[in-house]
Curated annotation (Swiss-Prot):
Summary of the function given for this chain in its UniProt record: Inhibits host transcriptional machinery, by producing modifications to the phosphorylation state of the C-terminal domain (CTD) of RNA polymerase II. Inhibits phosphorylation at serine 2 in the heptapeptide repeat (YSPTSPS) of the CTD of RNA polymerase II, suggesting that the elongation step of transcription and/or 3'-end processing is prevented. Inhibition of host transcription machinery leads to shut off of host cell protein synthesis and inhibition of the host innate immune response. NSs also seems to be involved in the nuclear relocalization of host PABP1.
GO biological process: symbiont-mediated suppression of host gene expression; viral process
Protein name per UniProt: Non-structural protein NS-S
Family named by the database record: Belongs to the orthobunyaviruses NS-S protein family.
Organism taxonomic ancestry: Viruses, Riboviria, Orthornavirae, Negarnaviricota, Polyploviricotina
Record's keyword terms, sorted: Eukaryotic host gene expression shutoff by virus, Eukaryotic host transcription shutoff by virus, Host gene expression shutoff by virus, Host-virus interaction, Inhibition of eukaryotic host transcription initiation by virus
Amino acid sequence: MMSHQQVQMDLILMQGIWTSVLKMQNYSTLLQLGSSSSMPQRPRLLSRVSQRGRLTLNLESGRWRLSIIIFLETGTTQLVTTILPSTDYLGI
């Protein structure tokens, strides 16, 4: 579990989908991150950045990079997902 003064985060696998549980003051929200079949490794927290009323949690799982942006005043969340290109060479 990751904890910030206003936000706590836990990652769970729910019905084959990695899900972030965000607990903010008086309520909780679930944010689906991705399928465990395409993201087999549990996402791990790389960094958290707090600036001007928002908190950004940066996670990674294999080639997946995820940023969860939490607007602290409203509790609104935004998920930005990037999948890095494969480094496999097919040599065709």
